[in-house]
Amino acid sequence: MGRADVAAALVERIQPTALAREQRLPVLPAFESLIPGGGLRRGSTLATDGPAATSLALAAAAAASQDGAWVAAVGFPSLGLLAAAELGIALERFVLVASPDTEIGPDNEETAWAAAVAALVDAFEVVLVQATHRVKVRDGRRLAARTRERGAVLVQVGSSGWSEGADVTLEVTEARWEGLADGYGHLRSRRVTVVGGGRREASRPRRSELWLPSTDGLVESVVPDPVPLRAG
């Protein structure tokens, strides 16, 4: 049984159950002003980019997983469960999935990849995806349509591989670790600048500085409210 089949088999067990009563999944307070409506809209796509794109994506999905949503991550060979937990992911509702096998041949690899991701969208409420190839426009549109149909949230990590833009974008434009002093000590916190944008309701740019994480291991705002940017 292939990975797409395994993911499809999970549909009956983990299928979203609150589509009618809840149209947005919660996010941590640090993200509420960066994401329109203060939550992840079901049926939408989110893209994270920049030097901390994976950490940002996990943190964006953390509150949803804590609230009961199942989260899958596909295409992250170096991601460990401890790192996900430290960013707030509830591991009892988190599944790491390897990229689809490539034995089928290079001509069909991208199609198999898209089918595997589509199966995960059917089964999970939030799906984090890191593409190792350029996603075809056709596949990107089909995945977006599947996401809308299923009421899931598709998170594109490292958006440069995607031809289609996301509904909401979060880009880390600056990141620096803090904690070292005079050549000794430990890296204890990471301060990042995040710029938010996107389409329609997300088109007005936003900017905020976050601890990802703070010295206490939390994801939180450095300044409580993000700074509005003038649309150029």
Where in this protein do the model-derived segments appear?
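Detector for small/aliphatic-rich hydrophobic stretches
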Residues: 1-73, 199, 229-232
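Hydrophobic/aromatic beta-strand patches that form the interior of the parallel beta-sheet core
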Residues: 46, 72, 95-97, 155, ...
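Phosphate-binding/switch region of NTP-binding enzymes
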Residues: 159-224
